[in-house]
Amino acid sequence: MAWTPLLLLFPLLLHCTGSLSQPVLTQSSSASASLGSSVKLTCTLSSGHSSYIIAWHQQQPGKAPRYLMKLEGSGSYNKGSGVPDRFSGSSSGADRYLTISNLQFEDEADYYCETWDSNT
């Protein structure tokens, strides 16, 4: 099987809340991996917001965004309807991870994380 690079882009999406101190999410600009391999995308919450819940979304070229999962600081996650088992979430401190295993052509997309104040 020939090595085929797969480019995954994940720009930042931040859902603003009414709190005084707004969380900031940091994501790397892009990642690439080959078909059949795994990739781990990171979304980091700013200081003082490490307990916030985030959501991961996928936007394939020419399509509307798709909700993938809600991810808590404990690492517990709930996936959206029809999201393949190849997609999983995990957490460590302020970092929230989206892992995609056994990469497929259709995984080439933009990946966004967003957060909100779960107390509002």
From Swiss-Prot:
It comes from the Eukaryota. Gene3D superfamilies: Immunoglobulins (2.60.40.10). Residues 54-70 are annotated as: Framework-2. Disulfide bonds join C43-C113. Residues 47-53 are annotated as: Complementarity-determining-1. Pfam families: V-set (PF07686). Keywords: Adaptive immunity, Cell membrane, Disulfide bond, Immunity, Immunoglobulin, Immunoglobulin domain, Membrane, Secreted, Signal. It is found in: Secreted; Cell membrane. Residues 23-120 form the Ig-like domain. One of its GO terms (biological process) is immune response. Transmembrane segments: none annotated. This is Immunoglobulin lambda variable 4-60. It comes from Homo sapiens.
